[in-house]
């Protein structure tokens, strides 16, 4: 049986990923700083841990039973300090967004590289890392992989995502980590945040319509 660690399992995408991995027959451990807000996750093991702590990342990555020098087959790194436009574009949360997310990724890359047989790592990046000048024309967005440079993200959130992409690929070159990166766009759907500034645009619009209809 394959094993997977989902960092950020208490979030929207992480929760759906846990379900998909279980459907595919994986043994899954979920880790997050909080439990999932909307559903009971089908994890084989769920741990509430702050992954800004290297010690907690070591704890999360160790196999559930047996030889603790063995880690998971796959690690899905979705944990981050993030939210919708009301959270990441105001400037009020820039320091936390950059510090907290960078610490998590620094810890995950470092700890994974120390195992004799490191796990495969998937990192969830964001389209926010693309240059602002490539996103000004909604009819002609430039989001090809090679359009990321010259770098000029429009938010500190985007800069941190770009930094962490480079971090993981540096660990690939120097330590042989097997890395995969996906640059997510505006992901939304069931069990996603819908208020408090961390919701995505579609959820925010639905909430506003519902609020107006209520009155």
Residues of each region from the PLM?
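NAD(P)-dependent short-chain dehydrogenase/reductase
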Residues: 133-142, 166-215
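Conserved glycine-rich Rossmann-like NAD(P)H-binding loop of the short-chain dehydrogenase/reductase
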Residues: 26-35
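Active-site helix of classical SDR
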Residues: 156, 160
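NAD(P)H-binding glycine-rich loop region in Rossmannoid oxidoreductase-like domains
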Residues: 51-101
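Rossmann-fold cofactor-recognition segment
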Residues: 42-54
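Conserved Rossmann-fold NAD(P)-dependent oxidoreductase catalytic core, especially the SDR/UDP-sugar
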Residues: 106-154, 180
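SDR active-site strand-loop-helix element
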Residues: 7, 31, 75-81, 121-127, ...
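N-terminal Rossmann NAD(P)H-binding glycine-rich loop of SDR-like oxidoreductase domains
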Residues: 4-24
């Amino acid at each position: 049986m394959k094993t997977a660690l989902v960092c950020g399992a208490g979030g929207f995408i992480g929760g759906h990923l846990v379900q998909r991995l279980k459907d595919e027959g994986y043994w899954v451990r979920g880790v997050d700083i909080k439990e999932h807000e909307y559903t009971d996750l089908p994890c084989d093991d769920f741990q509430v841990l702050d992954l800004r702590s290297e010690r907690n990342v070591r704890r999360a990555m160790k196999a559930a039973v047996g030889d603790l020098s063995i880690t998971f087959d796959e690690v899905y790194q979705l944990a981050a300090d993030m939210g919708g436009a009301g959270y990441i574009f105001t400037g009020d949360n820039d320091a936390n967004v950059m510090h907290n997310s960078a610490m998590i990724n620094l810890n995950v890359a470092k700890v994974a590289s120390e195992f004799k047989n490191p796990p495969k790592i998937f990192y969830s990046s964001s389209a926010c890392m693309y240059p602002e000048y490539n996103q000004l024309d909604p009819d002609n967005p430039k989001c090809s992989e090679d359009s990321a440079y010259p770098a000029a993200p429009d938010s500190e959130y985007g800069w941190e995502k770009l930094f962490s992409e480079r971090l993981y690929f540096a660990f690939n070159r120097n330590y042989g980590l097997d890395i995969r990166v996906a640059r997510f766009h505006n992901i939304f759907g069931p069990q996603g945040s819908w208020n408090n500034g961390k919701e995505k645009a579609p959820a925010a619009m639905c909430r506003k319509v519902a609020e107006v209809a209520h009155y």
